[in-house]
Regions:
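Glycine-rich phosphate-binding loop plus the immediately following alpha-helix
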Residues: 124, 147-191, 214-215, 219-223
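Glycine-rich beta-strand-to-loop/alpha-helix junction loops that act as flexible
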Residues: 78-81, 98, 136, 264-273
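Conserved phosphate-binding catalytic cores of ATP/NTP-utilizing and phosphoryl-transfer enzymes
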Residues: 109-131
Length: 287
């Protein structure tokens, strides 16, 4: 089965052809990230306008790269929520029109389930049950995937998502958007123990909170500026990264230990962070 997938929940317009849910035949991404970077983050109105501008050509290229037409596609899938409402509407309406015109089934996909399912593309032998940490700009969830379409949320952020905290800390430190890669790059030359940042306490064993941690960094930087003292960007980036990644890894591994999960995976943009992957991998070996 060949499925045309369409994604437009944030600042990237994407389309892909996937075979049997495991093999990517083509994958095309059109992004407005450079334009968004001028504002230090995603501007919803700009994102929506760029989706409307890019989506037709993006889908056409995905089909062309796969050497297919809509006649070869068995279904159209589209992310329907959550996301920036204007951005989501562009993708959903385009997908609805395309599916109707081609006489193909339309499959709505939840954003978080899409993040989780991306692991099926890179881990061909992966199958439920498994535990997944979804960490992105809008979400920080620990999810038990009990079956192919059955999920149980064990924990989540009670305020800021991990990726959002990364972006705001990056902006405070004068690092470019997107914040995740920028903080990680700066952290390579820093001391992760240079700044003593707080460990947030939150109700719910697997829940997380990053608002206080983000605020602690902002206050540290502002206090130093008011006193005319320098802030070591590399050290602060490393200290923040170490704290937030330690929290995420600890919560995930604690859930894995308590549930007896035999497989643990990561999803979302923050999952690209090398330190987080190292912490989870090292900890998983001890379970």
């Amino acid at each position: 089965m060949y499925v045309l997938g369409i994604e437009s929940t944030c600042d990237e317009t994407a389309a892909a052809i996937v075979e049997d849910g495991r093999k990517v035949i083509s994958n095309v991404i059109s992004t407005s990230v450079k334009e968004q970077a001028l504002y230090g983050g995603v501007v919803p109105e700009i994102a929506s306008r760029r989706h409307a501008e890019y989506i037709s050509a993006t889908v056409d290229k995905a089909l062309a790269d796969a050497n297919m037409t809509m006649k070869d596609v068995d279904a159209v899938a589209v992310t329907f929520a959550p996301g920036l409402i204007g951005a989501v509407l562009v993708g959903v309406n385009f997908a609805k029109g395309l599916a109707y015109a081609a006489g193909k089934p339309l499959v709505p996909v939840h954003h978080l389930r899409g993040h989780i399912a991306a692991n099926y593309l890179t881990h061909q032998s992966l199958h439920p049950p498994f535990l997944c940490l979804v960490a992105s700009g809008g979400h920080s969830h620990i999810v038990m995937v009990e079956d192919w379409c059955r999920y149980k949320v064990l924990g989540r952020t009670v305020d800021d998502a991990a990726g959002e905290a990364y972006d705001k800390v990056a902006r405070t430190l004068g690092l470019p958007y997107p914040g995740g890669p920028s903080v990680a790059a700066a952290a390579r030359d820093g001391d992760p123990h240079a700044y003593k940042l707080p460990v947030p306490h939150v109700e719910g064993k697997y829940n997380v909170s990053f608002s206080g941690l983000k605020t602690a960094v902002i206050n540290e930087v502002h206090n130093a500026e008011q006193k005319g003292q320098p802030v070591n960007v590399a050290d602060m980036a490393a200290s923040f990264q170490e704290r937030i990644d330690q929290i995420l890894a600890k919560k995930l591994l604690s859930a894995a230990s308590d549930t007896g999960a035999k497989q643990v995976v990561l999803a979302g943009g923050v999952a690209a962070n090398g330190r987080l992957r190292q912490l989870v991998n090292d900890g998983a070996q001890k379970l």
